[in-house]
Swiss-Prot record:
Organism lineage: Archaea, Methanobacteriati, Methanobacteriota, Methanomada group, Methanococci
Protein name per UniProt: Histidinol-phosphate aminotransferase
Molecular function via GO: histidinol-phosphate transaminase activity; pyridoxal phosphate binding
Gene3D superfamilies: Aspartate Aminotransferase, domain 1, Type I PLP-dependent aspartate aminotransferase-like (Major domain)
HAMAP family: HisC_aminotrans_2
Cofactor dependence: pyridoxal 5'-phosphate
Catalysed reactions, as listed in the record: L-histidinol phosphate + 2-oxoglutarate = 3-(imidazol-4-yl)-2-oxopropyl phosphate + L-glutamate
Gene: hisC
Family: Belongs to the class-II pyridoxal-phosphate-dependent aminotransferase family. Histidinol-phosphate aminotransferase subfamily.
Pathway: Amino-acid biosynthesis; L-histidine biosynthesis; L-histidine from 5-phospho-alpha-D-ribose 1-diphosphate: step 7/9
């Protein structure tokens, strides 16, 4: 019997996750100087993380032989102050928000349970739900209506078998937010757990922030992350805000030491450096508007409104998204080809914010590629 005969059938159905391309990969493949490559494909903070983090990391070097604290009181206190949520309603994960997603599936899903996912959206939801035995019921963000959530496609899929519903807002990759009244209607129409993914909420109008709903409703879990505006994608720190009962159940099965000493120190310092946070947020929104307005001038592109640090763009010059993105790669520009997102036609790509210098160079290159 080979290993293929022993691997679970559901695993064989999966395709490997397609991440955004790195500067190093493009430099190798196309012979381009890495310093000249413009990386706008992974929804990162182009200004990086707080400069104060480097010093804090050096303080941890002498302690790397010691296990980290499973629960770091200082980190929990800083997250509590930032979100204005009680510490006992917070759970922190060491693989970004992905760990929180996976742990909630582990405590909720039995074989045959149902999970509702509107698409196109973040692909990790379906991977985690399926691997734990869930049947996926697909809802939709309506392409014909600027990718607004088709709320009826969610409500009509709710059954007694529904254990969880994922709502990404702002949605990745479309960038739009789900109206608060629609989320309220969904939450109040079911006792299934509604996971509101707020990975990009800092870039949105504060009225769209529903983190406090974790205290108002027993069936809400809000996902947050340090990977975006805080510039810590490489440290993999995310967290959830939810009811005390759900936190308790998740702590029973959560990996004990998933947050490293380095990731804890980085997250604490990022939260404390409020000046750098505000700078990155304000300049990030300005960068977003600069790219959006610049791309809107090209007749061969359709650019969708966004409340995140990226925007979805449709190619209308006869190329599909992979062909178009290949042209950009050869010119040293990395954007995200969205062909791998379930529910999208092969004509879309996603552009993240850049520094203002990167934006200027990117838009100049775009003028050479499209009309």
């Amino acid at each position: 019997m080979s290993i293929d005969d022993k691997v679970r059938a559901i695993v064989k159905e999966f395709k490997a996750y397609v991440p955004g391309k790195s500067k190093e990969e493009i430099a190798r493949n196309y012979g381009i100087d890495p310093e000249k490559i413009i990386k706008l494909g992974s929804n990162e903070n182009p200004w990086g993380c707080s400069p104060k983090i480097a010093e804090k990391l050096m303080d941890e070097v002498s302690k790397l032989h010691q296990y980290p604290q499973p629960i770091n009181p200082e980190l929990m206190d800083e997250i509590s102050k930032f979100t204005k949520m009680p510490v006992e309603n917070i759970i922190v994960g060491g693989d970004g928000a992905d760990e929180v997603i996976d742990n909630i599936m582990r405590i909720l899903i039995d074989e045959g349970d149902e999970v509702i996912i509107p698409i196109p959206t973040f692909t990790q939801y379906a991977i985690s739900a399926k691997i734990h035995g869930a049947n996926i019921k697909w809802a939709k963000f309506d392409e014909e209506n600027e990718f607004k959530l088709d709320i009826e496609s969610v409500l009509n899929n709710i059954t007694e078998k529904t254990k969880a519903i994922f709502l990404c807002t702002p949605n990745n990759p479309t960038g739009n937010v789900i109206p608060t009244e629609d989320i309220k209607k969904i939450v109040e129409s079911t006792d299934a757990l509604v996971m509101i993914d707020h990975a990009y909420i800092e870039y949105s109008n504060e009225d769209y922030d529903l983190t406090d709903w974790a205290l108002k409703y027993d069936n809400v879990l809000v996902l947050r992350t340090f990977s975006k505006v805080f510039g810590l994608a490489g440290q993999r720190v995310g967290y959830g805000v939810t009811s005390k009962k759900i936190v308790d159940y998740m702590m029973r099965i959560k990996p004990i030491f998933s947050l490293t000493r380095a990731s804890q120190a980085s997250a604490i310092t990022a939260l404390q450096d409020k000046e750098f946070f505000e700078k990155c947020l304000n300049e990030g929104i300005e960068s977003r508007e600069e790219i959006y307005n610049g791309l809107k001038k090209f007749k061969q592109l359709e650019v969708y409104p966004t409340e995140a640090n990226y925007m979805l763009v449709k190619v209308k010059n006869g190329m599909n998204s992979s062909e178009f993105c290949e042209v950009l790669l050869k010119k040293g520009v990395i954007v995200r080809d969205c062909y791998s997102f379930e529910g999208l036609e092969p004509y879309y790509f996603r552009v993240s914010i850049g520094t203002f210098d990167e934006n200027e160079r990117f838009l100049k290159i775009m003028s050479e590629v499209v009309e």
